Regions:
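N-terminal hydrophobic or amphipathic helices/low-complexity stretches enriched
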Residues: 1-18
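N-terminal glycine-rich anion-binding loops that anchor highly charged ligand groups
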Residues: 17, 35, 39
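N-terminal capping segment at the start of a domain
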Residues: 15-31
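Cofactor-binding active-site loop characterized by glycine-rich and histidine/acidic residues
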Residues: 25, 38-165
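Short coil/turn segments at secondary-structure junctions
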Residues: 2, 6, 27-28, 116
């Protein structure tokens, strides 16, 4: 499905804004995996602002689409996307990865609204995604599951097992 030039430009502008917010978050935190964050921003922007069906006011809505950031170290980008979308207050970004913050380098699904799976151990996201998609099929649900993998985790055997499922 091709995007119109107007939609494409709007998404490009939003991704640029989110990259700036990611840079601010890195500055406030004093550290972060900025390369991983920058590399995933276009994908997350398009997923969240164009294709995913979600309700910010109801983050655990049963029929929502799921997003799993397998390369959990890119949480430095995921946090700004979730805050910009309205799941969390943008002020939380100023505490990213600081002692006592709900937002660590690897976002915790039990602490950060909008996170569907806690990730960080490389290679587990695809398996979680396959399980989530299989659950949708078994429950006769229409929600989609989006998984973003990092190239460095593709050597993990669990990815290949998930791919063969």
């Amino acid at each position: 499905m091709a995007l119109s030039k107007q939609v494409w430009l709007a998404l490009e502008k939003k991704a640029h804004e989110l990259r700036n917010l990611c840079l601010d978050t890195t500055y406030w935190a004093g550290s972060g995996h900025i390369g991983g964050g920058m590399s995933v921003m276009d994908i997350m922007t398009v997923c969240y602002h164009k294709y995913m069906h979600i309700k910010v006011e109801e983050p655990n809505w049963e029929d929502r689409d799921r997003f799993i950031l397998s390369k959990g170290h890119a949480g430095i980008a995921y946090a700004p996307v979730l805050c910009d979308f309205g799941f969390n207050d943008k002020e939380m970004l100023k505490t990213f990865n600081l002692s006592g913050s709900k937002m660590g380098i690897h976002l915790d699904a039990n602490k950060v609204r909008g996170v569907d799976a806690s990730t960080g151990s490389l290679g587990h996201g695809l398996s979680i995604g396959v399980g989530t998609a299989l659950a949708a099929r078994l429950l006769k649900k229409d929600y989609k599951t989006f998984v973003v993998l990092g190239d460095g985790e593709l050597d993990e055997g669990s990815n290949w097992e998930a791919a063969m499922s």
